[in-house]
Each structure stands twice: as C-alpha cells, then as structure tokens.
C-alpha cells in the first residue's frame, strides 16, 4: 500500500485517557511556564499574520474575546492557487521546513468506512483537510526562521 508518511488511519475505535505519574509531574511543572509559552506563541502567530498578509491563504479565525494558545498555526490555501496543499507541503519540507498535514477526515478512516461513511458525506471537513497546512510554531522559533518560512511560502505560491 502506498502510504504517505504524514497519513494515519483509525482501524478501531478506542480510548486511552490514562496519564502516567511522570506525565502528570511534567505537566504540573510546565504550568508555571504556561503564560510565558502562550504569550510567545501569540507573538509568533502575529508575526506570521504580518509576514503572510496578502498571500492567497486563509488564517484560522480566533474569537476576539478569547486568547488562543496557538498549539498549532494552521493556514489554508485558497482555491485560486494552482498548487495542492500536498505539493506545498512537499516543497516546504524539501527546504527543511517542518510543516505538517493534519486532521484527515475521520469519516474516511477504515473504521468509519466499515460503518458506511464515504467521501462526499462531509464536504467541508474534506475541503479543510485538502487545504490546511500546519506551520512551525514553538516558543523558541527564531524570527530569522519564521521569515524563511514566510519567504518560502511566497516563492512557492507565486
């Protein structure tokens, strides 16, 4: 089977909500840094907005009354662009930019296909999955690296 390395499939329905003691201790220690991490990620997100403004992409909408943690920074390629998100992904990865494709529509996973779900039943989720790319975002992302990401996207999309 020809599987792309970013893809994943749900073969079975299952849950695992257990957290180890070590994970709990690590999580508790990280809470002290949470505000700093969120502020830094918000600065990086704002810089992405500024650097990518005017490009044929859509940004994730953020409620003005909320503060996003920007766990991810997702852009969506507009339909007017003559490049697929997979091609953009591949070209950015060739430049050593660690972008990701996320959120494969769950109704297209084998488990749900066996239940009768098929392509075309949830068009918006399919369109989202076919256009969304997660850009690098982490507290220590340098301005230089972020500018390189933005410059690369501009070069590829134009």
Task: Describe each PLM feature range.
Residues 79-87:
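Internal helical hairpin/lid segments
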Residues 81, 94, 113-158:
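PLP-dependent enzyme catalytic core of the Aspartate aminotransferase-like
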Residues 1-5, 47-51, 87-120, 127-133:
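Conserved PLP cofactor-binding pocket of PLP-dependent enzymes
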Residues 74-78:
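Short hydrophobic/aromatic beta-strand micro-patches
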Residues 1-72, 107-110:
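Active-site region of PLP-dependent enzymes
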Residues 40-43, 87, 148-149:
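Short, solvent-exposed alpha-helical surface patches in well-structured domains
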Residues 27-30, 102, 137:
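A secondary-structure boundary/capping signal
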């Amino acid at each position: 089977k020809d599987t792309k390395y970013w893809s994943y499939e749900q073969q079975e329905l299952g849950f695992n909500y257990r957290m180890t003691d070590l994970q709990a201790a690590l999580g508790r220690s990280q809470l002290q840094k949470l505000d700093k991490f969120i502020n830094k990620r918000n600065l990086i997100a704002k810089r992405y907005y500024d650097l990518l403004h005017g490009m044929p992409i859509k940004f994730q909408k953020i409620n003005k009354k909320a503060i996003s943690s920007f766990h991810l920074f997702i852009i969506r390629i507009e339909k007017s662009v003559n490049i697929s998100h997979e091609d953009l992904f591949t070209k950015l990865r060739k430049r050593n930019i660690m972008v990701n494709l996320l959120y494969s529509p769950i109704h297209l996973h084998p488990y749900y296909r066996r239940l009768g779900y098929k392509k075309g039943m949830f068009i918006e989720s399919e369109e989202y999955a076919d256009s969304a790319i997660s850009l690098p975002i982490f507290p220590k992302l340098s301005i230089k690296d972020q500018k390189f990401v933005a410059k690369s996207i501009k070069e590829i999309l134009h």
